[in-house]
From Swiss-Prot:
Mg(2+) binds at T26. Signal peptide: none annotated. SUPFAM superfamilies: EF-Tu/eEF-1alpha/eIF2-gamma C-terminal domain, P-loop containing nucleoside triphosphate hydrolases, Translation proteins. Residues 81-84 are annotated as: G3. It is found in: Cytoplasm. Its EC number is 3.6.5.3. GO terms for cellular component: cytosol. Monomer. It comes from Christiangramia forsetii (strain DSM 17595 / CGMCC 1.15422 / KT0803) (Gramella forsetii). This is Elongation factor Tu. GO terms for molecular function: GTP binding; GTPase activity; translation elongation factor activity.
Amino acid sequence: MAKEKYDRSKPHLNIGTIGHVDHGKTTLTAAITKVMADAGYSEASAFDQIDNAPEEKERGITINSSHVEYSTEKRHYAHVDCPGHADYVKNMVTGAAQMDGAILVVAATDGPMPQTREHILLGRQVGIPRIVVFLNKVDLVDDEELLELVEMEVRDLLSFYEYDGDNGPVISGSALGALEGDEKWSKTVLELMEAVDTWIELPERDVDKAFLMPIEDVFSITGRGTVATGRIETGVANTGDPIEIIGMGAGKLTSTITGVEMFRKILDRGEAGDNVGILLRGIEKSQISRGMVITKPGSVTPHAKFKAEVYILKKEEGGRHTPFHNNYRPQFYVRTTDVTGTISLPDGVEMVMPGDNLTITVELIQAIAMNQGLRFAIREGGRTVGAGQVTEILD
């Protein structure tokens, strides 16, 4: 049977709901899918489908998160919702769910709470460019002045963390009301999505950068050759393009792309963000393995020394029970593989406690394909003890 093509007619964005526990993030996520389904754009996802978030492992860290998809008139969205606060912290630092923008949910009954602040700060640290606010549960607040006060507080908080608190949209509504089909509240969700469509800009996609895909798995298909699977990090893979395969400090291989597949469908091309299988001409399965990267020839250089912003897991999150000191030597899990490296702490920092967030310098024992913004996990004996991203390359 001929494979159908994947529809790319609407621009795609990754967003997520953030905010304090029990402020209505999951209810809002379900309400958006319902309202958009009623408008004829996509299918609904039920609350318990979203709330029953599966565990995922990203860079060895266990994260619970639910992914739903829906469309508006203008765009197609992949939306991530996390049940627990620690899941958000880990999700954002590891880049498990790369967000192009976020919907901050604040219950009008409570106003901004500690996690509201933490999520905004995290959004700033990991580079979420814009935030739209949904003031939830306004059906439970009779006092108009109280609503205005809460909105002012949220705007001040956004401005404090260098978001545009003055001009950013704040939509008031009731996620539960919309989920229950009350037209008055469904309209507020439509209004929210219009705000998301206009305020959250289409990111400058990584499509324009040079092609790079870390290899996750390798198969050989009888009669067709070797297929490498993975998520395209940057650029575009076209059938017929020449490529290089760069190993860990090893020599490089050259080949040509003979086909690209996604969701069991044939594509003319794969682009940044797509999970694809790439058919490689003249490459034996034994020559390539997980941890190598496929790139546009000459586009990536290997590096071993860099500065990074890191989060060290707490004991309760499965991290270390004790602090570590200068010259600590863990493994760095980068893209799809581990490399040993030595950590140098900033001047004046004697030790790092579980739960800390700081800037460190790292020197790896072998150079790997590296770029600024590259994310990694820090591991010790197969156990993840931290996560971070490269902020500056030093060699």
